Amino acid sequence: MIKSTNIQVIGSGIMHQINNIHSLTLFSLPVSLSPSCNEYYLKVWSEWERNGTPGEQRNIAFNRLKICLQNQEAELNLSELDLKTLPDLPPQITTLEIRKNLLTHLPDLPPMLKVIHAQFNQLESLPALPETLEELNAGDNKIKELPFLPENLTHLRVHNNRLHILPLLPPELKLLVVSGNRLDSIPPFPDKLEGLALANNFIEQLPELPFSMNRAVLMNNNLTTLPESVLRLAQNAFVNVAGNPLSGHTMRTLQQITTGPDYSGPQIFFSMGNSATISAPEHSLADAVTAWFPENKQSDVSQIWHAFEHEEHANTFSAFLDRLSDTVSARNTSGFREQVAAWLEKLSASAELRQQSFAVAADATESCEDRVALTWNNLRKTLLVHQASEGLFDNDTGALLSLGREMFRLEILEDIARDKVRTLHFVDEIEVYLAFQTMLAEKLQLSTAVKEMRFYGVSGVTANDLRTAEAMVRSREENEFTDWFSLWGPWHAVLKRTEADRWAQAEEQKYEMLENEYSQRVADRLKASGLSGDADAEREAGAQVMRETEQQIYRQLTDEVLA
């Protein structure tokens, strides 16, 4: 029984003083508040709204606060309102959504709170967390230190902050996401932990991994060894240690154990070579480019490329060129430098091609030599597809067909490599993808593929794999290529320019089908599968009908033009 209630404002928060309470604590207060409490909150919130700064949407926040209090709602959503501060929060809420604001600190948190989503703010610290808290997401902030973590916490996401150390992890924790911080050590993992994201830190040593863990993302740390418990994880578990300087002994041991006939542990992804990133180039963009040209051209080339130094991904492209010069192909392949120089000249003449190529090169952020080589393959593909789309092959259908066949073969090889990766327990997927392209470059006439790679020996790709892959590519090419080519974007671009009337007729035929047949064909397909009224099934059926229609129309057009 509560005989009297006094409310005092202390600092920026509210403290309820309950007098003469018989066997009642603050955490067992009834959900509904007295009118005087409501009046207090409304007064505080009104004043907070009036004192807002330009850009803050405090009027919207005030309305949501008021409705939340009046209706005793459990969830309060103040996300994406450009708020710089928060007032006292309704005491009954269990979920607080404050994502994507400009908050640097938080007020005292309600005592029954279970879920906080506070990512994408500017928080430098967190207040004391209530004992009831089960889920905390404060990623993408500026937090340097975490408070004590409640025992009931099961999900903790504090990635992309400024943490140097973590507190003791609670026993119920199932998910820990702390990637992108400044951690050099980690406390013991709780026995119930299932998911771990620890990438992009400075961790030198891991504690033992609990058997419950099914996913551990540990990329780009300073790990030279792994705990033995990693090999005792379940067979369906996934561990990624790419970008760590694992010792030669560790690599050999892992490879020996994971390739054994009795191995039943997790799949482990690693990377060969120096794991340092190449985001900081050794040279400016202009200098990195001119290094590929003969001395008598360097001055003119430098002047041209200076104009591109502020384009998106220019720095990573410069770093990529630095690393490309140190690959096996650059050192051993005759004419490689001239090939790169000719490619760079084409980039300087086309803003669209340059933008595409800079974006492709941005993905090669690791300095592993074979990753750079695979990126060079992709850049060659980008160039040829761009040239085809721009009209280089408008008068040479044979050359366009040859290019299409190469792109088709590469696509099939990627499918084969993807399937191969799934079968390996200790794998660098870059080496697998590159191995199929490099080792079959001559037999499949892959002009875009480098002819040498450094780490084929660790790819896990066998001679039998290569024979099987070649046979599969040739079989699928014989049965599927013409259908694939009829849907290929560069071929459509050529048809629009060289067969404008036929293209227009094909498009008209497609639109007539959409108007007259599409809905009925989708409905028939859903009825046949017993999925009428299922929105997801309807979208999938619609995509299938559209693809079948385009396949039929564009295949007929392709056959007519190529006849």
Curated annotation (Swiss-Prot):
Pfam families: LRR_TTSS (PF12468), NEL (PF14496). GO terms for molecular function: toxin activity; ubiquitin protein ligase activity. Residues 271-281 are annotated as: Linker. It is found in: Secreted; Host cytoplasm. Exists in an autoinhibited state in the absence of substrate protein, probably due to interactions of the leucine-rich repeat domain with the catalytic domain. Is activated upon binding to a substrate protein. Its EC number is 2.3.2.27. It catalyses: S-ubiquitinyl-[E2 ubiquitin-conjugating enzyme]-L-cysteine + [acceptor protein]-L-lysine = [E2 ubiquitin-conjugating enzyme]-L-cysteine + N(6)-ubiquitinyl-[acceptor protein]-L-lysine. LRR repeats lie at residues 69-90, 91-115, 117-130, 131-150, 151-170, 171-195, 197-209, 210-233. The keyword Magnesium does not apply. Residues 284-563 form the NEL domain. The LRR (leucine-rich repeat) domain forms a slightly curved solenoid and may mediate interaction with target proteins. Belongs to the LRR-containing bacterial E3 ligase family. NCBIfam families: IpaH_Shig (NF046045). Interacts with human RBCK1/HOIL-1 and RNF31/HOIP components of the LUBAC complex. E3 ubiquitin-protein ligase effector that inhibits host cell innate immunity during bacterial infection by catalyzing 'Lys-48'-linked polyubiquitination and subsequent degradation of host RNF31/HOIP. Host RNF31/HOIP is the catalytic component of the LUBAC complex, which conjugates linear ('Met-1'-linked) polyubiquitin chains at the surface of bacteria invading the host cytosol to form the ubiquitin coat surrounding bacteria. The bacterial ubiquitin coat acts as an 'eat-me' signal for xenophagy and promotes NF-kappa-B activation. This is E3 ubiquitin-protein ligase IpaH2.5. It comes from Shigella flexneri. The gene is ipaH2.5.
